[in-house]
Curated annotation (Swiss-Prot):
Nucleotidyltransferase listed as a keyword: no
Signal peptide positions (record): 1-26
Annotated GO biological process: cholesterol efflux; cholesterol metabolic process; chylomicron remnant clearance; lipoprotein metabolic process; negative regulation of cholesterol transport; negative regulation of fatty acid biosynthetic process; negative regulation of lipid catabolic process; negative regulation of phosphatidylcholine catabolic process
Note: Apolipoprotein C-I is present in acidic (APOC1A) and basic (APOC1B) forms in P.paniscus, P.abelii and P.troglodytes and perhaps also in baboons and macaques. The two genes for ApoC-I arose through a duplication process that occurred after the divergence of New World monkeys from the human lineage. In human, the acidic form has become a pseudogene sometime between the divergence of bonobos and chimpanzees from the human lineage and the appearance of the Denisovans. Pseudogenization resulted when the codon for the penultimate amino acid in the signal sequence was changed to a stop codon.
One Pfam short name: ApoC-I
Gene name as annotated: APOC1B
Family per similarity comment: Belongs to the apolipoprotein C1 family.
Cellular compartments annotated: Secreted
Name used for this protein in its record: Apolipoprotein C-I, basic form
PANTHER family xref list: APOLIPOPROTEIN C-I
The protein's role, per its UniProt record: Inhibitor of lipoprotein binding to the low density lipoprotein (LDL) receptor, LDL receptor-related protein, and very low density lipoprotein (VLDL) receptor. Associates with high density lipoproteins (HDL) and the triacylglycerol-rich lipoproteins in the plasma and makes up about 10% of the protein of the VLDL and 2% of that of HDL. Appears to interfere directly with fatty acid uptake and is also the major plasma inhibitor of cholesteryl ester transfer protein (CETP). Binds free fatty acids and reduces their intracellular esterification.
Entry keyword set: Lipid transport, Lipoprotein, Secreted, Signal, Transport
Protein source organism: Macaca mulatta (Rhesus macaque)
Amino acid sequence: MRLFLSLPVLVVVLSMVLEGPAPAQGAPDVSSALDKLKEFGNTLEDKAWEVINRIKQSEFPAKTRDWFSETFRKVKEKLKINS
């Protein structure tokens, strides 16, 4: 008797599993995926500009530029002396 009850239950469960997800649970809409991608791109752009502006405002680029200028000037002077 148990076998007669468990087989129909098993068939119903198996048919529900094989039927697949409901349309609301299916793949998300393409436009929503594109909106999420656009939002991610905008966020990434904002963060990149923030980092670039922070680097421009720091004194590291100025010190680096001065160091390269000074080093280049010294090399130029040494080449003039040796010539």
